[in-house]
Amino acid sequence: MLVLGIESSCDETGVALYDTERGLLAHQLHTQMAMHAEYGGVVPELASRDHIRRAIPLTEACLSEAGKKLADLDAIAYTQGPGLGGALMVGASMANALAFGLNIPVIPVHHLEGHLLSPLLADPKPEFPFLALLVSGGHTQLMAVRGVGDYEILGETVDDAAGEAFDKTAKLLGLPYPGGPLLSRLAESGSPDRFTLPRPMLHSGNLDMSFSGLKTAVLTLVRQQESAQGELDEQTRMDICRAFQEAIVEVLVKKSLAAMRQAGMKRLVVAGGVGANKQLRAALNDAAARKRFDVFYPPLALCTDNGAMIAFAGAMRLKFAEPAGGFTIKPRWDLSSLPAV
């Protein structure tokens, strides 16, 4: 069964081909990062227009890479939500038009389910059940995953997502958009001992998290340093980046360990863009070695938004249940509302 996946929820256009017998056959991705950098953030209207420009050429490139034709497709999956309404509409329009013309099923996919299942595209693959740490620019959640569609949210951020906190803090430090990845790179050269920032809700007694207060703490620290020395020098900026990243990582790791104890699970799956963070991976790998559990990640290329995860999630939905179909988008969509298969 050959499934075409289309991702267009925000500022990446992703198209991929997944075969249930042979695995991922082709994967094409275009990022709009450079286009939005001029504005310091994602401009929804520009994002939608760029998806329109890119979706068909990327699909053609994907088919060519795999040596396939449209007539070979058995189904088409698309990101139904959550995301930017106009951007989602591009993928939904294309998927439904192609599926109608080819007389094949169309499969709406939850964007976060795509992220959750993306580590199953790696090798070795995690087995159900597992605990998932979903950590991205828009979401930070801890979930018990017992099967496709069987998700229980155990804890989540009560304000900013971890990736959002990275980007906002980078902006406070004067780093160019997108600042989160650059902040992480600068943190690698920062001193681990010079500054210490708070760990919000680390001892809250539940699995929820909070990261908005870290921005305020960084702003206070920046003002203190500027008052003492004038403009921040590069080393001070790197040291602040290090302190910020260490605070985020410690909260994510300790909350994940607590969630695993609560759920009684020995497998941890990390998904989402922040899952590519080197310090987070190192800390989780160290914890896994000490606590004797297994940790799984998607391939680095599939940590960001991509069509491969949508094609795979769509294939799983098609394999185990009738696709919902219908020309709809859901810019706001609770993952826990998905039916299990």
UniProtKB/Swiss-Prot annotation:
Q: Which InterPro entries does the protein's record reference? A: ATPase_NBD, Gcp-like_dom, KAE1/TsaD, TsaD
Major localization class: cytoplasm
If you read the UniProt record, what top EC class would you report for this enzyme, in one word? transferase
Residues engaged in binding Fe cation: 111, 115, 305
Q: Which residues form the signal peptide?
A: none
The note describing how and how many cofactors are bound reads: Binds 1 Fe(2+) ion per subunit.
Q: What is this protein called?
A: tRNA N6-adenosine threonylcarbamoyltransferase
Q: Which organism is it from?
A: Chromobacterium violaceum (strain ATCC 12472 / DSM 30191 / JCM 1249 / CCUG 213 / NBRC 12614 / NCIMB 9131 / NCTC 9757 / MK)
